Amino acid sequence: MKDMGQKARHAAALLAVMSSEQKNKALEMIALSLEAQSAEILQANHQDLVNAAQNNLNVAMVDRLKLDKVRLCTIIDSVRQVACLPDPVGQVMSEWTRPNGLHIRRVRTPLGVIGIIYESRPSVTIDASILCLKSGNAAILRGGSDSFHSAHALHSALVKGLKEAGLPQDAIQMVGTKDRDVVGEMLKGLDGAIDVIVPRGGKDLVARVQSDARVPIFAHLEGLCHIYIDQSADLDMARNIVLNAKLRRTGICGAVETVLIDRQALKKFLPVLTALQEKGCEIRATEDIVFLLPDVKLASEEDWSQEYLDAILSVKTVEGIEGAIAHIRRYSSGHTESIIAEDMKVVKIFFNCLDSAILLHNASTQFADGGEFGFGAEIGIATGKMHARGPVGVEQLTSFQYHVKGNGQVRS
């Protein structure tokens, strides 16, 4: 592992001075390589799915693990989208001239070496790699045992693309073992080789990384996302948004887990809940909702802090916007919250009083995604307040330097 870290640092030094044209050529070569090796990639994924069935992996994890032609095409498209993004490296963030004539520029620079530790999503192999490459960073990937075959097949295509573009193959390295001790070594930083760790996976993985890492991390513990339906909301809009936010893909961190309804308008929005039930969604709710919809289960205290990642939704009535804010402040993981309302005064209160990384108005929580933000892809969602927050794209994978130009000035 130490040798891998040293190779990554050497590759990072080379990538830092690569031109935009060189990096974009490599991204196109990677896209072509993924297309050429698509059959092998899908076959490797099939083996992972067979193993998942034998290991009784839950539905949400299997959904994250699964690749098909459509998802693979989406991954390939994201590679080309990232290639089309502006190169962040070398961008002048701001500049000014001091009274003594010194001209100061704040310029974006790569972070260096990024370690990515992830579990069942094979797409992370590509998303993380291409974002690191575009931003001039080397990557060390450690995929989970569930996606082992898929991740290695995808990595093979990545290395082929790098080689054909003339870039160092050590720019994107993958740990070739399932040994969990490797994670501990990465969290220690590989003797200073790793600059940042990004975990992508379940609560246990992220909690371990947050507890044990000796290097900075970009992470979120869980996606406990909320939607508040205000009495001013449009019924059809509320129905469409909640159905999408819960059921489009239940196993992603942007799926809504709790819906809060203005108590004054509960009967108006009952069709939202019946529509969910018709789609097979289990609802766990407060007593006033159970009274009106007897086939709804009574929610327990644990339901308000539960990330289901399944077709299950907790629903609660609240005393207007103040009640919604109080609930979200108590239970939110700081990921994503949405308000459905036409009253802009209420919307303003929602946006001003909540501190989650992403706040939405009249839109599904499933838009909490770097691709949907125009970032091409994302390496993860960060809920911390230092450096990166929200979807982590190419700009968030850079630091900055101050470039100071003088004309012989000395300090008095």
UniProtKB/Swiss-Prot annotation:
It comes from the Bacteria. GO terms for biological process: L-proline biosynthetic process. The keyword Electron transport does not apply. It holds the Pfam family Aldedh. GO terms for molecular function: glutamate-5-semialdehyde dehydrogenase activity; NADP binding. It is an enzyme of class 1 (oxidoreductase). Pathway: Amino-acid biosynthesis; L-proline biosynthesis; L-glutamate 5-semialdehyde from L-glutamate: step 2/2. InterPro entries: Ald_DH/histidinol_DH (IPR016161), Ald_DH_C (IPR016163), Ald_DH_N (IPR016162), Aldehyde_DH_dom (IPR015590), G-glutamylP_reductase_CS (IPR020593), Glu-5-SA_DH (IPR012134), GPR_dom (IPR000965). PROSITE patterns: PROA (PS01223). Its main location: cytoplasm. SUPFAM superfamilies: ALDH-like (SSF53720). Its EC number is 1.2.1.41. It is found in: Cytoplasm. CDD domains: ALDH_F18-19_ProA-GPR. The keyword Chaperone does not apply. Keywords: Amino-acid biosynthesis, Cytoplasm, NADP, Oxidoreductase, Proline biosynthesis. Disulfide bonds: none annotated. Belongs to the gamma-glutamyl phosphate reductase family. NCBIfam families: PRK00197.1, proA. This is Gamma-glutamyl phosphate reductase.
